[in-house]
Amino acid sequence: MEEFKRYLELDRSQQHDFIYPLIFQEYIYALAHDRGLNGSIFFENSGYDNKSSLLIVKRLITHLITQMYQQNHFLFYTNDFNPNKFLRCNTNLYYQMIFEGFVVVVEIPFYLRLLSFLEGKERVKSHNLRSLHSIFPFLEDKFSHLNSLLDILIPHPVHLEILVQTLRYWVKDPSSLHLLRFFLHEYPNWNSLITPKKSSFSFSKRNQRFLFFLYNFHLCEYESIFIFLRNQSSHLCSISSEIFLERISFYKKKDLEEVFTKDLTAILWVFKDPYMHYCRYRGKSILASKDSCLLMNKWKYYLVNFWECYFYIWSQPRRIHINQLSNNSLDFLGYLLSVRLKPSMVRSQMIENSCIIENASKQFDTLVPITPLFRSLSKAKFCNMLGHPISKPVWAASSDSDIIERFGRIYRNLSHYHSGSLKKISLYRIKYILRLSCARTLARKHKSTVRSFLKRLGVGLLEEFFTEEEQVFYLTFPKASSTSGKLYQRRIWYLDIFCINDPANHE
C-alpha cells in the first residue's frame, strides 16, 4: 500500500468517490503485479499519456472478446488439436489481468479512509501485537472476573452477491459494483473458489487476497454492531471505531427513524453491560460477560436474527454455545481455556482462640489439548491413532542431520506455541513421540534396530537437539508460579507467533 502514496493521483472524478476511472490507470496494473512502471507488462507508444491509458484495458478486453468468440466458433480442427483448452487458458489469463487490477481499485476507498483517519494522529507500530499470543494476556487479565461467554462460529455468506450488497455502503460507484458482479458471475470456476471443503475455504492462490478482503469486510460489518451498541451505551467511545461506522446512511428510510429512536433505549437497556468483552480469531469469536446466562441467551438469539435480517444468512442457534467458565473448558487457538477456583486457607491466631479462614480465588487456566495433537501427529504419519510412534519412511532418503532437524523443528514449534500452559505433561508426551519416531526413521534408513542405533549414536544427541531454544522476546507475569527458577514452570507468551503450526503441514 505504500506505493499508493507515490502513484495515486486523484482527479475530480475520484474526489466524488468514483473509482471506476482508476481501472484505466497503468500504475494500477503495475502495483497489482508487484512491478514498477518500468517493469510493466504493458507497452505503450513513447508519445502516449501514461496517466490515463484507455488502450491498456481496451487491449485486454479486445483479446478477451476475441478469444471467447474463437472458442465458440472454431469447429473445423482435427482430432489431434483441441483449441478449447488453449483458448480457455488465454481467456482465463485476460480475465485474471483485469481482475487483479480491479482488486487494487476496490481497496483504494478503504485505504484513503484509513489515511484520512490516521492524519494528524500518532500511530504506534508494534509488530508484537500481531502475535497470536498477544490475546492471551488480555484473556488472563479479564476472564477470571467473568462468569459466562458465547462461543460463536461466524457463518460465511452462502452467496457472494450478499457481499456486494454489503459493499455498496462503502463503495459509492455503481459502475465498479456492476463490474464486480460481472467478475463474480462470469469468472471461470468462480464458485469453486469459495466452496467449503473440510471446514476451510479452498482459495485460489492468485485470488486469495481479494477473497480474504471480502471475507474480512464481512467480518468487519458483523462486528460493527458491537461497536455501535458500545458507543451508544458508554461515554467512553472507542476512537478506532470511527472508520467502521462511516456509512452513506445508517438507515435509508425516514419512516424508520422514529421507530428506531423509540426502540433504541429499550435495545440498549437489554444489551448494556460494562463488563462485556469480545475477541475473535478468523471465523470464531468469543463474547464474555460478568452477568448471568439470561443476558447471554438474549445475545444468542439477537445475533441469529441479526445475521438473518442484515446479511440474509440463515444460521442455526447451535453455532452459538453458552459456556460457563467455571464448569466447562473453551477450545480457542489451540488451548483449552477455563476458570477454576483456587482454594486457600489462612489461619488466624489470637491470644486464646484461633480460626481458619477459607477463601477461593478464580484463576485463569490454560491446558494443552492432547487429543487434537495426537490426531494431527497421526495424520502426519508420526504415530498411530493410539499415540504409538512410527517411522517416517518418506524422509528416509534425506541425510541424518536433515531428518533430525525436521523432527526437532516440529517439536520446537509445538513447544514454542503451547508454552502458555503451566502443565507441560502433554508436551513431554509429544516430545517422546517425535523422538522415538525420529529414532525409528533413522534406524529404518540404516537398516538397523532402534536399540542398536541409539546405542551407537547416543541418546544425548537427540536430547540436546530437541531442547534447543531460540532467543525470542516473551512475556511472563508475576501471578504465574515464579518460586522456581526454571523457566518451563512459568506461563510464557511469546510475541513472535503469527500462525498455528500444524505438524501435518511440515511435509
Curated annotation (Swiss-Prot):
Example of a GO MF term: RNA binding
Pfam family, one: Intron_maturas2
Main location: plastid
Entry keyword annotation includes Zinc: no
Any GO CC annotation of this UniProt entry: chloroplast
Compartments (UniProt record): Plastid, Chloroplast
Biological process (GO), any one: RNA splicing
Domain of life: Eukaryota
Keyword annotations from UniProtKB, A to Z: Chloroplast, mRNA processing, Plastid, RNA-binding, tRNA processing
Family: Belongs to the intron maturase 2 family. MatK subfamily.
Function: Usually encoded in the trnK tRNA gene intron. Probably assists in splicing its own and other chloroplast group II introns.
Name listed for the protein in its UniProt record: Maturase K
Gene it is expressed from: matK
